[in-house]
UniProtKB/Swiss-Prot annotation:
SUPFAM superfamilies in UniProt: Bacterial photosystem II reaction centre, L and M subunits (SSF81483)
Protein name: Photosystem II protein D1
Pfam families attached to this UniProt entry: Photo_RC (PF00124)
Chain sites annotated for binding chlorophyll a ChlzD1: 118
Tagged with keyword Calcium: yes
Function: Photosystem II (PSII) is a light-driven water:plastoquinone oxidoreductase that uses light energy to abstract electrons from H(2)O, generating O(2) and a proton gradient subsequently used for ATP formation. It consists of a core antenna complex that captures photons, and an electron transfer chain that converts photonic excitation into a charge separation. The D1/D2 (PsbA/PsbD) reaction center heterodimer binds P680, the primary electron donor of PSII as well as several subsequent electron acceptors.
Gene: psbA
Residues annotated as binding Fe cation: 215, 272
């Protein structure tokens, strides 16, 4: 018998790279979306850290009154933030090469755009990477669909809202106190608490937390014990086991008696679909609310909607909320505006009868 041996041509560098990129045996899956995700998220993270520590003040309102947000300029972890790009830039694309100098780019808040745009591109690629890994493992694609909810929320406050308002200076600052400031100003200008989509989003987030706690506690309370009383029930589980790890019938019976029968799921697939869909749909709706208010389609305003037979206003909670909104708006951009437009809608009072003459 004669054996013929042929030399196998070695795979090219590109083929080996493709195999490595798409291999599901790696400790961390990279994938083709990861080729874009990794550098963009590393760039966003690096610039965020540097700017949070050392960025100079930014002229956010475009009135030559810079606001400091970095640690080296007197802030701490709570008060520090990446200040949004200047109102003088508007929604123009403002990379480093568009500025006359690096100092000008920093003064006008260029790092904010760099971080936000790289971050959004990176998390969108993360969605694609989740789908790609699911596809290669033969799984269904719903993990990536669920992650579209937080990405939609981030895109709403960092991109859609600034574009709708005409300036990146209206975007959410990248910091703890900056986030709260953004929320207060958003309420003052758009009455978001009275927007139905936002209310549904709150129900989605809080309801999701409630359902998660209920499900976790029910499962933990109905584990099928495979161990002795002297060992943790957790040791009775073997990874990849075919048997159920908890008794869904017992959990269903408990919850059905605690509230009423039809408040409890008796189908595990329907239960877990509900647990996944409820918060995701809620966050989608919240993102839609911010996106609609970007175009000033604001929340409901019921102030002064109740009057007596003489036409006098009977104050309701809506009027208290409206007064709170006006108070927050007064505090916002106090150097750019003396008072909000809502308070300036009355008759104007003349303060000068003759235009002053200017000599020189």
């Amino acid at each position: 018998m004669t054996a013929t041996l042929e030399r196998r041509e070695s795979a090219s560098l590109w083929e080996r790279f493709c195999t490595w990129i798409t291999s599901t045996e790696n400790r961390l899956y990279i994938g083709w979306f990861g080729v874009v995700m990794i550098p963009t998220l590393l760039t966003a993270t690096s610039v965020f850290i540097i700017a949070f520590v050392a960025a100079p003040p930014v002229d956010i309102d475009g009135i030559r009154e810079p606001v400091a947000g970095s640690l080296l300029y007197g802030n701490n972890i709570i008060s520090g933030a990446i200040i949004p790009s200047s109102a003088a830039i508007g929604i123009h694309f403002y990379p480093i090469w568009e500025a006359a100098s690096l100092d000008e780019w920093l003064y006008n808040g260029g790092p904010y755009q760099l971080i936000v745009l790289h971050f959004l591109l990176g998390v969108c690629c993360y969605i694609g990477r989740e789908w790609e890994l699911s596809y290669r493992l033969g799984m269904r694609p719903w993990i990536s669909v669920a992650f579209t909810a937080p990405v939609a929320a981030a895109a709403a406050v960092f991109l859609v809202y600034p574009i709708g308002q005409g300036s990146f200076s209206d975007g959410m600052p990248l910091g703890i106190s900056g986030t709260f400031n953004f929320m207060l100003v958003f309420q003052a200008e758009h009455n978001i608490l009275m927007h139905p989509f936002h209310q549904l989003g709150v129900a989605g987030v809080f309801g999701g937390s409630l359902f998660s706690a209920m499900h976790g506690s029910l499962v933990t309370s109905s584990l099928i014990r495979e161990t002795t009383e002297n060992e943790s029930a957790n040791y009775g589980y073997k990874f990849g086991q075919e048997e159920e790890t908890y008794n869904i019938v017992a959990a269903h019976g408990y919850f059905g008696r605690l509230i009423f029968q039809y408040a409890s799921f008796n189908n595990s697939r329907a239960l877990h679909f509900f647990l996944g869909a409820w918060p995701v749909v809620g966050i989608w709706l919240t993102s839609m609310s911010v996106s609609t208010m970007a175009l000033n389609l604001n929340g409901f305003n019921f102030n002064q909607s109740v009057v007596d037979s003489q036409g006098r206003v009977i104050n309701t909670w809506a009027d208290i909320l409206n007064r709170a909104n006006l108070g927050m708006e007064v505090m916002h951009e106090r150097n750019a505006h003396n008072f909000p437009l809502d308070l300036a809608s009355g008759d104007s009072c003349p303060v000068a009868l003759v235009a002053p003459s200017i000599n020189g």
